[in-house]
C-alpha cells in the first residue's frame, strides 16, 4: 500500500493549462502505478486547459465548483460529483467560467506495452 498525503503530493505543470494548480496523487512523481495515474487540479476563475487531444483514456470528476468541458462538438457544464469519460485522442477543452475556483480529480490511463 502506498499513501500520498495531500500536503506532500508533488506538483506538476500540465501543458496548455493556465490558471491551474495541479498535483499528482498516484503515479509518475507520486510513485509507480501500472495502468493509470491520478491527479488533482485546482482551476481558478477564468482558468482552463486549452484544446488538445487526450493522450490516453481519461476520466474527469468535478469535486467542487463547476467546469465546462468541450469535446467532439459537445459542451457540458459539470458540477460536484459529475464526471466525463474521454477516449484516447478526443480533442477536449476545460474552462472555469464561474466566479469561484473548481477542483477536478483526473484519472488518466498509461500507455500499455504490447504483450
Q: How would you label these PLM feature ranges?
A:
Residues 1-35, 115:
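A short, N-terminal "cap"/entry segment at the start of jelly-roll beta-barrel domains
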Residues 23-27, 37-54, 88:
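Conserved short histidine dyad/triad with adjacent acidic residue
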Residues 30-34, 43-48, 64-66, 110-114:
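Short, charged/polar surface micro-motifs in flexible loops or helix N-caps
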Residues 49-51, 69-70, 86, 92-98:
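Short beta-strand His + acidic residue motifs that chelate non-heme Fe in jelly-roll/DSBH
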Residues 55-67, 72:
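Glycine- and acidic-residue-biased ligand/ion/polar-headgroup-sensing regions
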Residues 66-68, 75, 91, 101:
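Structural motif
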Residues 73-88:
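Short acidic-glycine-tyrosine-enriched beta hairpin
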Residues 88-114:
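Ligand-binding loop in jelly-roll beta-barrel domains
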Amino acid at each position: 500500500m502506498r499513501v500520498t498525503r495531500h500536503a506532500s503530493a508533488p506538483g506538476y505543470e500540465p501543458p496548455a493549462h493556465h490558471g491551474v494548480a495541479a498535483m499528482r496523487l498516484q503515479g509518475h512523481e507520486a510513485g509507480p502505478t501500472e495502468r493509470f495515474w491520478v491527479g488533482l487540479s485546482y482551476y481558478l476563475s477564468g482558468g482552463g486547459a486549452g484544446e488538445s487531444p487526450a493522450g490516453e483514456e481519461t476520466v474527469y470528476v468535478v469535486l467542487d465548483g463547476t467546469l465546462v468541458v468541450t469535446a467532439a462538438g459537445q459542451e457540458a457544464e459539470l458540477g460536484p460529483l459529475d464526471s466525463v469519460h474521454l477516449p484516447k485522442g478526443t480533442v477536449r477543452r476545460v474552462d472555469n467560467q464561474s466566479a469561484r475556483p473548481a477542483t477536478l480529480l483526473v484519472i488518466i490511463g498509461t500507455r500499455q506495452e504490447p504483450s
